[in-house]
């Protein structure tokens, strides 16, 4: 019997996987800053509508703001670690962050892991590492390892804190504050970029906008699932989205693929099925 959180988590997994492919195509034409700003604007709009139906909890605002700032810092740390270090080591290392979330959920929240559950988590982590691994990388700059380790800790800790916050106060506080922080950052880094409103009304621009709106809805589903379900299952489950996204990239935009990537995709898909059915 599926837990009540499983459909929400699977919806997030599928939509975020599609978003990865759409993002890849969009960034061929748009700058990262412009895309970041657009995502923030559309997400905040979706979350504002959701907040009307599910009002925020004033008692959870402080924690949500704190986590939103932590998420912004995590983004910078991860980006800087990637810039300085060999991506072939940094990416697989940070892909292990769900393991920390699982450890915290078991140790602090008392969540239990079955054999099937544990096997699914292991497969998800192995798939993430295989998908992230790159055997060749440019010369690393000093200080990348502490940053990569900090990124791992911040990502794993952030997912755990999100579980605690949404369980206590619901998802609305975190949704609105995180999008607001993202919008502020987006307006700053994309201040010289065109708005391109007309471009969003047709063709690929419209497809991108619709996908980002769907991704925002998926985030609502993910945090709603996290508020009622086990973080030790949900976080590793949605962390398999690169596997499905990679498969979609191969099929939809004919990206090149290696045996290592195929193995990672297979492991990720297997992990997603195992984690969902073990719920």
Task: Describe each PLM feature range.
Residues 1-69, 75-85, 133-147, 180-211, ...:
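Membrane-interface interhelical linkers
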Residues 2, 142-176:
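Selected transmembrane alpha-helices and immediately adjacent juxtamembrane segments
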Residues 11, 37-38, 93-96, 116-119, ...:
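Hydrophobic core positions of alpha-helical segments in small-molecule transporters
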Residues 32-36, 174-175, 234:
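Juxtamembrane helix-start motifs in multi-pass secondary transporters
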Residues 41-47, 93-107, 181-188, 218-219, ...:
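Alpha-helical transmembrane segments of compact multi-pass small-molecule transporters, enriched
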């Amino acid at each position: 019997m599926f837990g009540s959180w499983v459909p929400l988590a699977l919806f997030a997994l599928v939509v975020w996987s599609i978003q990865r492919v759409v993002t890849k195509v969009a960034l061929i034409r748009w700058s990262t800053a412009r895309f970041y700003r657009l995502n923030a604007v559309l997400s905040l709009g979706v979350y504002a509508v959701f907040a009307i139906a599910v009002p925020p909890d004033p008692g959870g605002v402080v924690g949500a703001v704190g986590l939103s700032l932590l998420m912004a810092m995590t983004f910078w740390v991860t980006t800087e670690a990637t810039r300085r270090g060999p991506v072939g080591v940094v990416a697989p290392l940070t892909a292990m962050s769900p393991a920390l979330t699982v450890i915290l959920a078991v140790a602090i929240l008392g969540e239990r892991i079955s054999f099937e559950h544990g096997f699914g988590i292991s497969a998800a982590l192995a798939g993430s590492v295989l998908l992230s691994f790159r055997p060749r990388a440019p010369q690393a700059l000093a200080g990348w390892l502490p940053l990569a380790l900090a990124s791992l800790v911040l990502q794993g800790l952030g997912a755990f804190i999100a579980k605690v916050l949404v369980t206590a106060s619901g998802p609305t506080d975190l949704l609105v504050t995180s999008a607001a922080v993202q919008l502020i950052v987006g307006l700053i880094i994309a201040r010289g970029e065109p708005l391109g409103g007309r471009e969003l009304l047709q063709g690929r621009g419209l497809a991108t906008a619709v996908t980002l709106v769907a991704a925002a809805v998926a985030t609502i589903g993910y945090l709603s699932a996290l508020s009622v379900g086990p973080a030790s299952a949900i976080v590793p489950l949605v962390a398999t989205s690169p596997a499905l996204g990679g498969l979609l990239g191969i099929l939809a935009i004919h990206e090149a693929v290696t045996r290592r990537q195929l193995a990672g995709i297979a492991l990720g898909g297997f992990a997603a099925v195992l984690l969902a059915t073990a719920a």
